[in-house]
């Protein structure tokens, strides 16, 4: 988004965590310090950064702040916005209640709940439904506009009953997603291994991504179709060893390749090497990885869920299934037995992805920015005018 807005003639400054690793930053990037330790899942925690960000902002002529996380850096953004009279936009990227288990006490409660502990389950449910939602309500009210990446997330936010306007602004796809990659042929040859089909998925290897379901699903398919496919899992995370062990238990370890982290510019080559993109997560707000796959003419086979259903049209650019292993396996087998339908889906997938190219999305977001800035300035002028205007006081007659 920053690159496309710059292409349109705007100055965009990025404030991002310092990962303590070599990066080639430009003059528009500011790195704020983070704690040395990371919570589970390799998520960096911003340190006390208000003073650092405030000092940097004070030297820049900023018209608008767009923040992407509601905690810590989000509070810094709204505080600075209020102090400098700058409107603040927030994009609701994540179903935060589904990521509580990365914090140690809630991870402990999650384990207890999984073991059938009713007290742990009750406390966790209270935290998800009350603590998280109340915090988000408070934060969203401090913002001047909220972007939801999909219509389903916009609807999800309606029960929050906030006065802040909510607009739909999906994440755009960079040009590299639509390019042809010569490496795709070599990747397919390496991993297909004389099988008939090659599937892939791109995901953090974490519990909320539901990859254990995916492995059980492909195991069920193998039992019915035989050894006719391989699966590439791109990504890394805390569940990797557990997933490898599960693939061995299910006797599909020779069909599943854990590729690990792949750089963004190479992911499209893996997409182009495959026949179908498998997706099992039920915690997405948009599912940008689905659109990236579609850009490479790759149909998506996914569980019907928030975010996913906004981009996957069942039977057109992919297939949506329930989270029943039996139904999931049956639906996948049905696709594979209808190659003409699969070919048609490839074209529709590409057409869908083209609607999300970065340039189009940047123009859409720019319109929202302009509208917000104009309305914010009008409201600020009115408040300043009211505060500075003195009104005659009429003496009360007795």
Regions found by a protein language model. Give the residues of each.
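Short alpha-helical donor nucleotide-sugar binding micro-motif in glycosyltransferases
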Residues: 261-262, 269-274, 365
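Conserved donor-binding/catalytic core segment of Leloir-type glycosyltransferases
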Residues: 192-218
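Short hydrophobic beta-strand element within catalytic cores of glycosyltransferases
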Residues: 299-302
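Nucleotide-activated donor-binding/catalytic signature segment of Leloir-type glycosyltransferases, i.e.
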Residues: 242-262
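N-terminal subdomain of nucleotide-sugar transferases
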Residues: 1-33, 366, 370, 381, ...
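Conserved acidic donor-binding segment of nucleotide-sugar-dependent glycosyltransferases
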Residues: 314-315, 319-326, 334-340, 354
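Donor nucleotide-sugar binding/catalytic pocket of nucleotide-sugar-dependent glycosyltransferases
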Residues: 16, 117-182, 193
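Aromatic "clamp/platform" in nucleotide-sugar-dependent glycosyltransferases that forms part
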Residues: 282
